């Protein structure tokens, strides 16, 4: 009897899932028709009246800038009841709506059928939305076998014709998904978040609230949004277009899709894509109500992971910004002092004292004959008068809950408009940045440090996370499995020794696969001596040798003669590239005005990557492509860690050769890197055993390994710019005597090392050029 009941329940669920797939198929067809009719776009399904005013009360009203009464003790008692709303950022009505959906679709039949353990989502995370869009594009080609048992169907129709599609959802931030023009115009992510939440507050008049926010009356539209989202694979741009077409906020509506995915009808083949910050930051996961418990997490481009976690949890502020913040805070406090109640007045005074203390310390550093950069003791930042009486916990909570930054920034904008002051471009609200920094100062991580850096007439203060282990640990411990993937993950030791140092080796699996190209499509070689015999030693003490730099130029010209089409040369830094180019521009003795650059230009046109190119990078790439397509060939002088060293594909004739000049070690003399290595050494020393001498030796080796790994990850990224598909072919030349060291070669990708082993004999530059000519001869250009 029980078996029959279970079978009937399963049959009913299967039929509903088939009906859902049929409905999604109809929507897919409908969307395809809409794409064909882009010249005549259809009206939105639900036309909403959008308030075209500023969204703020009139300028004569001052109430909008007044802080709500704040009682830290009372608010602390209420915190637990408000926690869900505060964390998620949803209005009460929207929370009720989403909770009702969750209850509506959470059928008890799940437990009866026993499918709950099979409800595994895949969270696919990458660095940028463009990379996630590439993944979505590939996902559209995937055809998965159906998880619906055909024997449970009672339909008379041919159920095999109903194909079960991959359930995919793209998540993004408000900044990426907001469709409210007035909110989008704020530009800054923190300001957009604050304004979005403000437009949902109970005290906001109905006509001033965001017209796109889902409400209790929008249940049908949210279901419709869900079906359109799941009908086809959509990237972040598609989600925004869908929200605009339907007149509903895609940020909040997509969260409802995530909640619906707990529903038994959507149990199979669920993939959620999201960028790094939404997964790696606890506050972002809380805001999305995102749980990864017992799910699979895949992180692509994982060579960036450790740096990404540290950067997400780091914040930088300048002295000039602190001074601006102080001016804004004091102006606001003076203007509204009669209307600010006791707690607000007290906390604002505390913030002014704290910011003044930080400002004064930075001024003292700027005025002293100190190095250009160094570490800062947090206690020195809080040494101002009365700062020691501040309760860090209460002030942190006040900063997060009072909306002070939003109120002050709004008042500043109001004054600008009132005085008819306008900037050519909107500036980032400085109070949000100050707030982020103060929160770091109030709650510093044991793995974090503070640094200063003098820059011209200003000085910046940075809180930097040195160790990402604990921030990533919660994800590792919650997830069913964590997969780190990348084309160039080598060297791997940092992941084992630092990111996963607390995990037993038996729980860690590493896989390294060969390249898609056959071995004969790659030639990789080190180059120690130039065509004139100079030894290439680009260490700090030897890299400025003009003789060596001139020989490097002649060698590059020789290699460019042997390598067809496009060659990309990567240098350790912009400063060193400028130094080399300056020497290459000098007339050569006895060469009748000839320069190294003119020798190279006989073979290929030369293009340069600048330090602050920004959007001009695309123009440079287009010029590089046009030059190669014209048959001239081109040499692109670039920098390791620059715009062109990562994320740009130099496939086919755009990258027939990659030259790596020197080893791009980070500046070991910088305060940041000294602190990083010191932290690694101390952590290793504390966890090691044996004699004092052995522990110190192990710690020093760990610091050296960590330093080398940072360099070689950057090198491997540059190498990976060429050879982008199975029919591609290219030459990789690493120019520096240190590339012949076993410890350096051991950190190269396996497919590079295999090619080097086949050509293990050291070759002079002229012989290597001959090898390159033979390699490229007879190959059909692509």
UniProtKB/Swiss-Prot annotation:
ATP binds at residues 80-87. PROSITE patterns: DEAH_ATP_HELICASE (PS00690), HELICASE_ATP_BIND_2 (PS51193). Its cofactor is [4Fe-4S] cluster. InterPro entries: ATP-dep_Helicase_C, DinG/Rad3-like, DNA/RNA_helicase_DEAH_CS, Helic_SF1/SF2_ATP-bd_DinG/Rad3, Helicase-like_DEXD_c2, P-loop_NTPase, RAD3-like_helicase_DEAD, Rad3/Chl1-like. One of its GO terms (molecular function) is ATP hydrolysis activity. It catalyses: Couples ATP hydrolysis with the unwinding of duplex DNA at the replication fork by translocating in the 5'-3' direction. This creates two antiparallel DNA single strands (ssDNA). The leading ssDNA polymer is the template for DNA polymerase III holoenzyme which synthesizes a continuous strand; ATP + H2O = ADP + phosphate + H(+). Its EC number is 5.6.2.3. One of its GO terms (cellular component) is nucleus. One of its GO terms (biological process) is mitotic G1 DNA damage checkpoint signaling. [4Fe-4S] cluster binds at residues 178, 196, 210, 249. Keywords: ATP-binding, Cell cycle, DNA-binding, Helicase, Hydrolase, Iron, Iron-sulfur, Isomerase, Metal-binding, Nucleotide-binding, Nucleus. Binds 1 [4Fe-4S] cluster. Residues 1-352 form the Helicase ATP-binding domain. Residues 23-66 are annotated as: Disordered. It holds the Pfam family DEAD_2. It is found in: Nucleus. A motif (DEAH box) lies at residues 300-303. Residues 23-42 have a biased composition (Basic and acidic residues). Its main location: nucleus. Belongs to the DEAD box helicase family. DEAH subfamily. DDX11/CHL1 sub-subfamily. ATP-dependent DNA helicase important for chromosome transmission and normal cell cycle progression in G(2)/M. May have a role in changing DNA topology to allow the loading of proteins involved in maintaining sister chromatid cohesion in the vicinity of the centromeres. Has a specific role in chromosome segregation during meiosis II. NCBIfam families: rad3 (TIGR00604). This is ATP-dependent DNA helicase chl1. The lineage of its organism: Eukaryota, Fungi, Dikarya, Ascomycota, Pezizomycotina.
């Amino acid at each position: 009897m029980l078996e029959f009941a279970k079978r009937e329940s399963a049959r009913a669920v299967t039929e509903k899932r088939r009906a859902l797939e049929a409905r999604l198929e109809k929507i897919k067809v409908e969307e395809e028709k809409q794409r064909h009719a882009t010249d005549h776009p259809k009206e939105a399904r639900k036309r909403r009246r959008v308030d075209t005013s500023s969204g703020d009360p009139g300028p004569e009203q001052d109430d909008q800038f007044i802080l709500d009464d704040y009682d830290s003790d009372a608010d602390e008692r209420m915190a637990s009841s408000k926690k869900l709303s505060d964390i998620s950022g949803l209005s009460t009505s929207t929370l009720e709506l989403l909770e009702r959906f969750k209850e509506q679709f959470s059928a008890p039949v799940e437990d009866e059928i026993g499918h709950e353990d099979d409800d595994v989502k895949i969270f696919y995370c990458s660095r940028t939305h463009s990379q996630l869009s590439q993944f979505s594009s590939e996902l559209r080609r995937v055809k998965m076998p159906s998880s619906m048992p055909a024997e449970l169907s009672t339909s008379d129709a041919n159920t095999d014709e109903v194909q079960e599609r991959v359930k995919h959802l793209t998540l993004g931030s408000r900044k990426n998904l907001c469709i409210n023009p007035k909110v989008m115009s704020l530009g800054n992510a923190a300001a957009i978040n604050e304004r979005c939440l403000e437009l949902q507050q109970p005290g906001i008049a109905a006509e001033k609230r965001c017209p796109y926010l889902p409400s209790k009356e929008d249940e049908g539209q949210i279901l419709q949004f869900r079906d359109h989202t799941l009908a086809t694979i959509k990237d972040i741009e598609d989600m925004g277009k869908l929200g605009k077409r339907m007149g509903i906020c895609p940020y909040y509506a997509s969260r409802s899709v995530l909640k619906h995915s707990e529903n038994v009808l959507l149990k199979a083949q669920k993939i959620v894509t999201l960028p790094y910050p939404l997964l790696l930051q606890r506050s972002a996961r809380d805001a999305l109500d995102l749980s990864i418990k017992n799910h699979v997490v895949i992180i692509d481009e994982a060579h960036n992971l450790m740096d990404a976690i540290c950067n997400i949890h780091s914040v930088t502020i300048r002295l000039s910004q602190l001074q601006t913040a102080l001016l804004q805070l004091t102006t606001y406090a003076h203007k509204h002092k009669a209307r600010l109640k006791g707690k607000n007045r007290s906390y604002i005074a505390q913030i002014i004292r704290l910011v003044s203390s930080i400002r004064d310390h930075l001024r003292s550093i700027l005025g002293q004959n100190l190095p250009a950069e160094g570490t800062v003791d947090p206690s020195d930042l809080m040494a101002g008068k009365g700062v020691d009486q501040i309760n860090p916990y209460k002030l942190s909570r006040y900063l997060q809950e009072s909306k002070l930054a939003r109120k002050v920034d709004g008042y500043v904008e109001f004054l600008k408009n009132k005085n008819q002051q306008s900037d050519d471009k909107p500036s980032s609200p400085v109070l949000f940045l100050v707030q982020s920094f103060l929160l770091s100062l109030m709650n510093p991580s044991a793995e974090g440090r503070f640094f200063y850096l003098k820059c011209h007439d200003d000085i910046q203060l940075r809180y930097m996370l040195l160790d990402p282990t604990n921030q990533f640990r919660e994800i590792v411990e919650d997830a069913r499995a964590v997969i780190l993937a990348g084309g160039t993950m080598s060297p791997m030791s940092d992941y084992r020794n630092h990111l996963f140092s607390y995990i037993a080796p038996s729980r860690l699996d590493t896989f390294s696969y060969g390249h898609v190209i056959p071995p004969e499509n790659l030639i990789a070689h080190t180059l120690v001596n130039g065509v004139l015999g100079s030894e290439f030693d680009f260490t700090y003490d030897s890299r400025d040798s003009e003789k060596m730099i001139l020989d490097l130029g002649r060698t590059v010209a020789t290699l460019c003669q042997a390598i067809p089409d496009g060659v990309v040369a990567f240098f350790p830094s912009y400063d060193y590239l400028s130094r080399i180019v300056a020497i290459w521009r000098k007339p050569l003795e006895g060469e009748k005005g000839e320069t190294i650059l003119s020798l190279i230009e006989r073979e290929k046109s030369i293009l340069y990557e600048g330090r602050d190119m920004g959007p001009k990078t695309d123009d440079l790439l287009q010029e590089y492509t046009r030059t190669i397509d014209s048959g001239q060939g081109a040499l692109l002088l670039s920098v390791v860690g620059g715009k062109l060293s990562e994320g740009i594909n130099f496939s086919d004739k755009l990258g027939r050769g990659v030259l790596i000049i020197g080893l791009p070690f980070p500046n070991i003399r910088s305060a940041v890197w000294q602190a990083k290595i010191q932290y690694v050494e101390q952590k290793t020393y504390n966890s090691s055993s044996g004699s004092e001498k052995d522990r110190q030796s192990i710690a020093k080796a760990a610091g050296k390994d960590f330093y080398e790994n940072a360099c070689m990850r950057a090198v491997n990224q540059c190498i990976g710019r060429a050879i982008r598909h199975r029919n591609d072919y290219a030459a990789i030349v690493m120019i520096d005597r240190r590339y012949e060291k076993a410890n350096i070669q051991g950190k190269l990708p396996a497919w590079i090392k295999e090619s080097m082993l086949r050509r293990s004999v050291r070759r002079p530059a002229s012989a290597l050029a001959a090898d390159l000519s033979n390699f490229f001869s007879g190959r059909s250009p692509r």
